[in-house]
């Protein structure tokens, strides 16, 4: 989980260490399993986004405890009144395994320069593999529509039309899209509801817009699938 929601670069130093170890006789193979995870709700999302601002005032332990107990109390009150909703969906996908030994056999690691080049290529390949299996969830889909529009007000109908078009674009890119109950309209409604309940999205006069100062948090969820629309280095 990154602080801004984006996929992060691989740790090449660790990969280099692994490949070096595999060059010794009798060393066991290392197999990488690409894992893509996404969440409709990350409990510490505001804290993660806030940590990116170097000028943000540091919060005290007392403030953190107050917010935690306030969060628990608020959700208990919603449960008692029958107005509590789940925090959305979490989804995980697995990609094709990548054998480090097979990678060594197929790539030149005869000297330090060649090994470093191979490590760089392996890192790109692994992150490409992870990116291809990151699931697209309702909140990320809706958040992306708002992020692309810069927070401009939009009706629910136009929002869903834009989200449908975005989903079609993602399907063409062979993205793993999770559609609860196999109902796209329901999925989009759930994503919108999640964001409005948290006041990240505000409804007024039949139009939805981004809440005051909430675009960074909304962008955090859009960033989870942003790599599908950017060039991914690695083999297809």
What are the residue ranges of the model-derived segments?
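Membrane-interfacial terminal anchoring regions of lipid-handling membrane enzymes
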Residues: 1-236
């Amino acid at each position: 989980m990154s602080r801004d929601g984006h996929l992060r670069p691989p740790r090449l130093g660790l990969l280099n260490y692994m490949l070096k170890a595999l060059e010794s006789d009798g060393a066991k193979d290392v197999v990488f399993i690409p894992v893509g995870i996404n969440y409709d709700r990350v409990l510490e999302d505001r804290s993660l986004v806030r940590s990116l601002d170097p000028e943000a005032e540091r919060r005290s332990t007392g403030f953190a405890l107050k917010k935690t107990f306030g969060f628990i109390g608020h959700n208990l009150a919603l449960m008692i009144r029958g107005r509590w909703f789940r925090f959305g969906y979490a989804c995980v996908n697995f990609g094709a395994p990548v054998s480090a030994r097979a990678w060594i056999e197929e790539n030149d690691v005869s000297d330090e320069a060649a090994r470093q080049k191979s490590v760089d290529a392996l890192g790109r390949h692994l992150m490409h593999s992870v990116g291809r299996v990151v699931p697209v969830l309702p909140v990320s889909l809706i958040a992306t529509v708002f992020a692309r529009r810069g927070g401009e007000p939009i009706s629910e109908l136009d929002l869903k039309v834009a989200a449908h078009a975005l989903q079609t674009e993602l399907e063409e890119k062979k993205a793993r899209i999770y559609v609860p109950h196999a109902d796209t309209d329901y999925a989009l409604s759930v994503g919108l509801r999640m964001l409005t309940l948290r006041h990240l999205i505000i409804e007024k006069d039949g139009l939805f817009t981004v809440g005051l100062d909430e675009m960074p948090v909304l962008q955090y969820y859009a960033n989870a699938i942003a790599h599908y629309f950017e060039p991914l280095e690695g083999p297809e």
